[in-house]
Curated annotation (Swiss-Prot):
Topology in membrane: Single-pass membrane protein
Sequence intervals crossing the membrane: 7-29
Keyword Membrane included in the entry's annotation: yes
Transmembrane helix is among the record's keywords: yes
Name of the protein in question: Protein PsbN
Subcellular location: Plastid membrane
One BP annotation, GO: photosynthesis
InterPro entries: PSII_PsbN (IPR003398)
Family of this protein: Belongs to the PsbN family.
Amino acid sequence: METATLITIFLSGLLVSFTGYALYTAFGQPSQQLRDPFEEHGD
């Protein structure tokens, strides 16, 4: 394969991996440990 194709595939995979990890952190198991500043200030 050409170098440009390999770089494109690598960067695409990196972007998909980062997006998946961000979604997992926001909505998966680790989200239980995140603090909610709006919950702390119940006006």
